[in-house]
């Protein structure tokens, strides 16, 4: 019965995706899938996909002629950090969170482990993309849209030096679609910090499902999994990270106060 329910849910979700893409059948602009809280990329969790579970929605869309990419950004990071990572994952290059933002929250502005070749390097106003975000992914896309359209200044009121934050890049996004996104925040955001009962087991399961374990992607905080560190120790150390006490983390962004 559970298997049938999963198939029904998958069929409805896939129908929704195809419905969205059919609205833009006049163009072949790429589709970028953006995961939500505790999400993961195609190279993590073995063959179990965030977008489709045992089924592979990206592959289904590709088989139907669409150019599709799955983003893999910080599952616990703030929408600012996630939007920055999303930009560089699509365009390519060294992640730069901005001088002002990095100084404000005490994070590493350009973490060495976060440089990307680019899913779609020719991305610009002449080659825009469709963005589909699930849950927190919808908020992240809205932040990306804002940052693309705004020239950001650092704490000294000097324009940020990165091509992304320092410039205005209108027309780079063809469409935005959000699925189950808490656009006005949620009163359930404390679940993020108090812990979800199955979360540790879920992450541990991911570690044995494939060649790549689940990663919290918090290099900007100087947080990495230690050599020979167990999944349990990695998870518990993450729970105690000082970043949770700041406004540069997922728990703040999904709260009612943080989303104002």
Indicate residue ranges for each PLM-predicted region.
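N-terminal signal peptide c-region/cleavage motif recognized by signal peptidases
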Residues: 20-22
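Bacterial N-terminal signal peptides that target proteins for export
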Residues: 2-12
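N-terminal non-catalytic accessory region
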Residues: 25-132, 136-200
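Glutamate identity and glutamate-enriched acidic tracts
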Residues: 3, 43, 58, 67, ...
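Helical cap/lid subdomain of alpha/beta-hydrolase-fold lipid enzymes
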Residues: 146-147, 152-260
């Amino acid at each position: 019965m559970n298997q049938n329910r999963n198939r029904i849910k998958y069929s409805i979700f896939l129908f929704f995706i195809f419905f969205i893409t059919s609205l833009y059948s006049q163009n072949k602009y790429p589709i970028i899938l953006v995961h939500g809280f505790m999400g993961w990329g195609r190279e993590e969790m073995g063959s179990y996909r965030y977008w489709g579970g045992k089924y592979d929605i990206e592959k289904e869309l590709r088989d139907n002629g669409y150019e599709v990419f799955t983003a893999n950004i910080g599952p616990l990071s703030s929408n600012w950090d996630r939007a920055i990572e999303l930009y560089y994952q699509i365009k390519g290059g060294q992640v730069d969170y901005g001088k002002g933002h990095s100084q404000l929250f005490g994070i590493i502005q350009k973490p060495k482990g976060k440089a990307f070749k680019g899913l779609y390097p020719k991305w610009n106003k002449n080659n825009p993309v469709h963005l589909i975000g699930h849950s927190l992914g919808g908020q992240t896309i809205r932040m990306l849209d804002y940052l693309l359209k705004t020239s950001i200044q650092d704490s000294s009121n000097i324009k940020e030096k990165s091509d992304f934050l320092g410039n205005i890049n209108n027309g780079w996004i063809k469409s935005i679609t959000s699925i189950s996104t808490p656009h006005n925040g949620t009163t359930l955001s404390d679940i993020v910090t108090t812990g979800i009962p199955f979360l540790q087991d879920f992450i541990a399961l991911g570690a044995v499902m494939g060649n790549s374990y689940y990663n919290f992607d918090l290099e900007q905080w100087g947080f990495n999994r230690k050599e020979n560190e167990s999944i349990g120790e990695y998870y518990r150390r993450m729970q105690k990270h000082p970043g949770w006490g700041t406004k540069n983390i997922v728990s703040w962004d999904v709260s009612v106060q943080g989303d104002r």
